[in-house]
Amino acid sequence: MNIAIIYGGKSSEHEVSLQSASSIIRTIDKKHKLHLIGISKNGAWYLHGDEERERIIKNEKAVLKIKKDEAKRVTVIPGGGAKKGLKAGDEFLPTDAVFAVLHGRFGEDGTIQGLFEMADLPYVGGDVMSTSISMDKEKTKMIWDYSGLPIVPYIAIKRQDWDDPEKKKAILARAEKDLEYPLFIKPCRAGSSVGAGMVKNRNELLEQAEESFLWDNKILVEACIEAREVECSVTGNTKTVAYIPGEIIPTHKFYDYEAKYTDPNGAELKIPADLNETQRKTIRETAIKAYEALDLSGLSRVDFFIDKRTGKIYLNEVNTIPGFTAISMFPKMCGASGLPYNELIMHLIELAIDRFKTDRKLKTCRQS
């Protein structure tokens, strides 16, 4: 099989993507041909040769690098002809499936998914609509709330409203009245907790809101509950499977970017999570409902809060391309349920091809 692995990207999670893709490359059987395509931080795509794959395989601590070789610039060819998909320089890259290991913006927001649709290529993960909605935390919460699923109280703020003095005054009054301090503020369309923070008073709220607005033009203000953080891996197209939940116990104030990726002691990961049977069942069932409410396919990691005081379970958010690093929860939870890393990766690729075949049966135009 010819598999394109795409990594890097124009995202705050560029470095995380390099780590995730490195782990995936190590686990794919060498009988499969890999096209390693690195996207620079300014958005240029470059093909990397087999020597990069060998370097990653031989050293478990090695991380992918992106070499800017203009002779290896990758272009995407729209479908409709005999040769479609991906091309590096003058070299056509036969591709059976694409695994875009891109976290955050331009990876989980429907943009690259639309590109693959136009190129007529099977790709891992949700489609354009489901990923774009799931990237927007406000829209995700609206759909979950409409579906009767439990969410933490919140308000969403747009940049233009925040910049209007009268609207800003009303927003602050509403946040303090309806939600009360402490509050948690984060960009609506960013990942890995970048631009996010907890605030205990108005001055901190004003400061944190400006930080969050650096990452998106819409931010979320949530009630901050003292909670356990539990996650659940989900895979599937028409048949959805939720795996054994895991728990994150941060040593930081909250599970921020440093705790996730740069501080080896940033959090304790417990798989399985210390839950009773009722809680475990509720989380797995709710994860499936949350996934299906968003019309997701392929894979996602669904994140939960469990209120330490009341025991109530809330949905937090969903990640349509979760981390695949050596310490990432998604593959570990699948592994704890009996699906080892190498089989998981091939399962996701098979799901991508299956969905592609199903979608190709649909009519796209009237026959003349």
UniProtKB/Swiss-Prot annotation:
Cofactor note: Binds 2 magnesium or manganese ions per subunit.
Annotated Mg(2+) 1 binding sites: D303, E317
Species for this entry: Treponema denticola (strain ATCC 35405 / DSM 14222 / CIP 103919 / JCM 8153 / KCTC 15104)
Family membership: Belongs to the D-alanine--D-alanine ligase family.
Entry-linked PROSITE patterns: ATP_GRASP, DALA_DALA_LIGASE_1, DALA_DALA_LIGASE_2
HAMAP family to which the protein is assigned, alphabetical: Dala_Dala_lig
Localization, UniProt: Cytoplasm
Any GO MF annotation of the entry: metal ion binding
Gene that this polypeptide is encoded by: ddl
Protein name: D-alanine--D-alanine ligase
Coiled coil segments of this chain: none
GO biological process: cell wall organization; peptidoglycan biosynthetic process; regulation of cell shape
